[in-house]
Amino acid sequence: MSTQPERAGLEASRLITVLANELKPVPPPQELRFGQSMTDHMLFASYDPVNGWSAPEIKPYGPFTLEPNSSCFQYGTSAFEGMKAYVGPDGEPRLFRPEMNIARFARSAARMSLPPFNPDELLKLIKALVAVEKRWIPAGKGYSLYIRPMIVAIGLLTSNTALLWVMCAPTGPYLKGGSQALSLLAMRDTVRAWPGGTGEYKVACNYGPTINPVQAALDKGYDQTLWLLGDKITEAGVMNVFIVLKRDDGGIDLITPPLDGTILPGVTRDSILALAAAHPARMTLPGLAPTTLLHPSERTMTMTELQAWLAEGRLLEMFSVGTAVVVQPIGNIGYDGKDIALPTFEGGRGPVGQALYERLTDIQDGRFEWEGWSVRCED
Amino acid sequence: MSTQPERAGLEASRLITVLANELKPVPPPQELRFGQSMTDHMLFASYDPVNGWSAPEIKPYGPFTLEPNSSCFQYGTSAFEGMKAYVGPDGEPRLFRPEMNIARFARSAARMSLPPFNPDELLKLIKALVAVEKRWIPAGKGYSLYIRPMIVAIGLLTSNTALLWVMCAPTGPYLKGGSQALSLLAMRDTVRAWPGGTGEYKVACNYGPTINPVQAALDKGYDQTLWLLGDKITEAGVMNVFIVLKRDDGGIDLITPPLDGTILPGVTRDSILALAAAHPARMTLPGLAPTTLLHPSERTMTMTELQAWLAEGRLLEMFSVGTAVVVQPIGNIGYDGKDIALPTFEGGRGPVGQALYERLTDIQDGRFEWEGWSVRCED
């Protein structure tokens, strides 16, 4: 269209900040429930196909008005992200590999036909928001400020009018039991993602259909679902999955399903693979012997294989990973009416999961410098 | 929960009607664009898990305010329906088999973990809304009032707080070209629905992911997509599909994919199957000889079969059906880089499609009484 070049981009330099007159009390860390206490402010911008992006605003968190025929209600046209800000020993707010989340956010938005934005500008804006909300970031291991960027189509189907906002909520450990091993119910009848579907994008449409099956798992006494595609293991709840296997050569395989379109390309997933690959040649993982060779790989894993590995005594650990949980051990899988008990460990995680958890949270909190993954919000 | 019995149901007897002070001008029928001119009023009710359903209201159509962390934005938790009101020769507004839409609406809502409602009460309320908006129903074949019931989760994921509303827009023939034959692009890479997915429900999540592939089809000069699952034909755009085949015994097969979980159980689909089964024993379809025996059936159909039927000269007609289009002929399928030309007919529809279209619209408009399918809004 001829108007395209004149449309404004999302520009951090146009940021308008209007602070709340009255600030809310920050709840004590132990009272935090995941994503339930929104901070004082949000980042907000709107897009229309004539003018492009509005000047972004940091403004008091609050409701907005939408037309009843907005396409997001009818067609689920929305994409989102989940990322975290941390405060480390220096008291400075930090983000963890935020460019990966923002790049995925842009891909998810494009998949849902939502308007494009400049990822670098959005990162600058998120840093500005986190700097404003710094007092909300709880200190302490397992605590952080959860950051939820969203982009949602409003107006009619073809209008390409959208709202983008970023909201924040302080958060403690994701699961009540801390690092206790999860008991998962493997789902055969409900399929989270399929070839040609949207499983590799972080779009609203992947989540609504999972609410009922997750509730069914809870009702049966499980903590979460294990998503299957036929016999293939794909994800656990909203997390990627890893299996740790003993090798014949004394080393350890660390495997996770490949990014075949049905798997969310998780930032934690990618980080786990990278950290495992770095041990021990480039860095020793805490608590793991430098002589223990880790062999990370992306490969298909099936329930049949899982049971065989278990029977052979090769399956050492299974865990799920994600921004919310970081590394969460899996101790049991309900499958075809029986429970498959996996190796469990005092304190929760097995040695490989624990080593990766420690190193990852050290990097996130700014206690260990690694490849620029932990990014300061204030220069 | 102990509070459950005290929660209010959706009750038509509690309806509060507040009419708009100023009514909008009704656009001339020829200027109507599908779903773009909302009428003066909407039906509205809200649900919370403590109080249940609010007293339903008919009130001026207008925006509402939502919290940025409403679950519909993050998880696509919404379901909807598409139905139509017609005015026939008697000038009375009518609905077409509305109980089927409302039953599907309740099933879709339940699939998305949205609160339950009494379908009979919702039907009473929709009739009341249509009666209020009677002046908006355009007269004439192919014209009607499109009715969009919606139910959307607001609030936090687990809060089960929801809004239900019904909005209306006058509408003319769905596709600009009237009954001209559609040219469809068969989609291999993007899959609309999958076993274990939500294809059989009318939920927002089924639609957002189709916007890009539909645009890709339009960009290549096609009118719509033909959805495949592997080699299987499933749906066309947002429509069910039928193929008409010549039988060796001189009769005619009318086939459509079975409701295996990947197919929306369309009201028009069901009506077409029923009308075909009634011909000629119980009723003669207009323009079809009583000696022409129709054999409707639900069976899997593949692209391989379609091409074989075409080569054998057995494929007489292919058409798509739905509330919006009623019966729309399909004249071409782009598949694996080539175009498959289907039989086309002067005026658009072939004899079987035309006969079914005529009888169905006669029933919808109240010109032909059939099994109580056309339901008056005012008693």
Regions found by a protein language model. Give the residues of each.
Chain A
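Extended, Lys/Arg-enriched charged tracts that mediate electrostatic binding to polyanionic substrates
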Residues: 137-152
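Internal, well-ordered alpha/beta segment that forms a basic, Gly-enriched binding/recognition surface
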Residues: 129-132, 140
